[in-house]
Amino acid sequence: HKKLSKRSGHASYEDLIDQGFLTEAVINFVALLGWSPEDNNEFFTLDELVKEFDYHHMSKTPAVFDMTKLRWMNGEYLKKMDFDKFYEMALPHMKEVVSRDVNFEKLASMIKTRIEIWADIKDQIDFIEQVPDYDINMYVHKKNKTNLENSLEVLKEVQPLLEKQEDYSNDALFE
């Protein structure tokens, strides 16, 4: 945790927005620096903040800027965002990474719950443009009894199931 300081890196609102944070998340997060709402709710709209804010709940200790918590909060805002709005805002970021003709809506639905800031999109989808080199030992798993010899057969067996899959969310994949 660091005190908010321009000397310790990006500190302005504009810097945070440029890094891929949502305005709503930044405002919500900053409002909670040094203030605790009565009901311990962490998520507020701007109107709710105006209504709920009470200076009697200000902390006497200095506020600590926790970038990890801001990233988490921003990710929660992205998860709750209406899909059409998410898609519209994510599309330029996806197109920066993927130049091929792909179903960007489906791609957006797959990454919506997996990113915390817009800049995370690149690491989630860059494999579409170029498959990275993988260590072949990732196919070895003693508990699942897979090794370099039988892994190809297992992958061939799973491929038809994955091709039929329409929902690639974590919950759907692990059903």
PLM features: residue spans?
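Alpha-helical recognition segments enriched in aromatics with Gly/Pro capping
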Residues: 2-78, 85, 92, 175
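Small-residue-rich helix-loop
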Residues: 83-175
